[in-house]
Amino acid sequence: YGRIKDTFTPVIIEKMKEYKIEVCGHIVCNDDMEKITKAILELKEKGAEMIVCTGGMSVDPDDKTPGAIKATGARIVSYGAPVLPGARFLLSYLEDGTPVMGLPGCVMYAKATVFDLVLPRIAAGIEVTKKDLAHMGNGGFCLGCKECHYPNCSFGKGV
């Protein structure tokens, strides 16, 4: 861990800025379930109202992030969404309602992903349900147009 330059965090910070969300902390962990669980709980303790985990969830079947999120006691809404890019998205809520999301790598490089469909609702304080995620399957395939017009396109129309 620490051998690969973190290019994910700047992308998340920019997406958060669009909704005037302040990033109150950033913790880098290796793929260790206990450390990830501890980091999530530490961010919650610092007052985080939303927690975003990034890592190898979309490419590494042994990634520890989903298990670490579950180990916090979070209620898993879904680990997977009928949306491309973003099929390996994980959504959960801590006991007090704080959303904890596990983001697949596509969020780092694709302009529009499942995170872009979910983030506005989370930012507005709306709890996203399994049914909401299922509805995202209608228009859930980003065509990757040469010139992106999201949100003025068919992507996410089921939201």
Where are these regions (language model features)?
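Glycine-rich phosphate/diphosphate-binding loop of Rossmann-like nucleotide-binding domains
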Residues: 1-31, 35
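Short acidic (Asp/Glu) and glycine-rich catalytic loops that position anionic groups and cofactors
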Residues: 19-20, 48, 96-99
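Gly/Ser/Thr-rich loops at beta-strand to alpha-helix junctions
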Residues: 1, 56-60, 105-109
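Short, solvent-exposed amphipathic alpha-helical segments in soluble enzyme
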Residues: 6-12, 41-42, 67-71, 116-120
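Flexible glycine/proline-rich
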Residues: 68, 72-159
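Short N-terminal signal/transit or membrane-insertion segments
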Residues: 28-37, 151-159
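Short catalytic-loop micro-motif centered on adjacent basic/acidic residues
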Residues: 23-26, 52-53, 102
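Glycine-rich phosphate-binding loop
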Residues: 38-90
